[in-house]
Amino acid sequence: MAIERTFSIIKPDATARNLTGAVNAVIEKAGLRIVAQKRIRMTKEQAETFYAVHKARPFFGELVEFMTSGPVVVQVLEGENAVAKYRDAMGATDPSKAAEGTIRKLYAKSIGENSAHGSDAPETAAIEIAQFFSGNEIVG
């Protein structure tokens, strides 16, 4: 299998509770390597650009407000089938439906405050990674 990269965000609800290390432990247990990571405060413009696919949805404003409400940790993860592995490690968007041991089952507060974002495809991952990282920041 080919090694691929995916993009992750540890969201404000998790960073506010100092869960970065705990989330990273789940990521590493899933067999993924963290090859880039930084803690940032997402601007309104960054959040609107990042979530532009949801612009017409009724929750868009709340999503942007939430993602800019506190620090986030943006990451590049690497491994075999990284996109699928990380999505499995995150669990279902609704934490009540997430499998035991997943990030969202363990740490999410609600569907909206679900602690983590992960890319949905390798192509999306490449776009998302480029929004937050330059090539020399990714150390594989």
From Swiss-Prot:
<feature type="binding site">
    <location>
        <position position="87"/>
    </location>
    <ligand>
        <name>ATP</name>
    </ligand>
</feature>
<feature type="binding site">
    <location>
        <position position="104"/>
    </location>
    <ligand>
        <name>ATP</name>
    </ligand>
</feature>
<dbReference type="Pfam" id="PF00334">
    <property type="entry name" value="NDK"/>
</dbReference>
<dbReference type="GO" id="GO:0006163">
    <property type="term" value="P:purine nucleotide metabolic process"/>
</dbReference>
<keyword id="KW-0479">Metal-binding</keyword>
<comment type="function">
    <text>Major role in the synthesis of nucleoside triphosphates other than ATP. The ATP gamma phosphate is transferred to the NDP beta phosphate via a ping-pong mechanism, using a phosphorylated active-site intermediate.</text>
</comment>
<dbReference type="GO" id="GO:0006183">
    <property type="term" value="P:GTP biosynthetic process"/>
</dbReference>
<protein>
    <recommendedName>
        <fullName>Nucleoside diphosphate kinase</fullName>
        <ecNumber>2.7.4.6</ecNumber>
    </recommendedName>
</protein>
<keyword id="KW-0597">Phosphoprotein</keyword>
<dbReference type="GO" id="GO:0004550">
    <property type="term" value="F:nucleoside diphosphate kinase activity"/>
</dbReference>
<comment type="similarity">
    <text>Belongs to the NDK family.</text>
</comment>
<feature type="binding site">
    <location>
        <position position="114"/>
    </location>
    <ligand>
        <name>ATP</name>
    </ligand>
</feature>
<keyword id="KW-0547">Nucleotide-binding</keyword>
<keyword id="KW-0460">Magnesium</keyword>
<dbReference type="InterPro" id="IPR001564">
    <property type="entry name" value="Nucleoside_diP_kinase"/>
</dbReference>
<dbReference type="InterPro" id="IPR036850">
    <property type="entry name" value="NDK-like_dom_sf"/>
</dbReference>
<dbReference type="GO" id="GO:0006220">
    <property type="term" value="P:pyrimidine nucleotide metabolic process"/>
</dbReference>
<keyword id="KW-0808">Transferase</keyword>
<dbReference type="GO" id="GO:0005524">
    <property type="term" value="F:ATP binding"/>
</dbReference>
<feature type="active site" description="Pros-phosphohistidine intermediate">
    <location>
        <position position="117"/>
    </location>
</feature>
<dbReference type="InterPro" id="IPR023005">
    <property type="entry name" value="Nucleoside_diP_kinase_AS"/>
</dbReference>
<dbReference type="GO" id="GO:0005737">
    <property type="term" value="C:cytoplasm"/>
</dbReference>
<keyword id="KW-0963">Cytoplasm</keyword>
<keyword id="KW-0067">ATP-binding</keyword>
<dbReference type="GO" id="GO:0046872">
    <property type="term" value="F:metal ion binding"/>
</dbReference>
<dbReference type="InterPro" id="IPR034907">
    <property type="entry name" value="NDK-like_dom"/>
</dbReference>
<keyword id="KW-0546">Nucleotide metabolism</keyword>
<feature type="binding site">
    <location>
        <position position="11"/>
    </location>
    <ligand>
        <name>ATP</name>
    </ligand>
</feature>
<dbReference type="GO" id="GO:0006228">
    <property type="term" value="P:UTP biosynthetic process"/>
</dbReference>
<feature type="binding site">
    <location>
        <position position="93"/>
    </location>
    <ligand>
        <name>ATP</name>
    </ligand>
</feature>
<dbReference type="GO" id="GO:0006241">
    <property type="term" value="P:CTP biosynthetic process"/>
</dbReference>
<feature type="binding site">
    <location>
        <position position="59"/>
    </location>
    <ligand>
        <name>ATP</name>
    </ligand>
</feature>
<keyword id="KW-0418">Kinase</keyword>
<comment type="subunit">
    <text>Homotetramer.</text>
</comment>
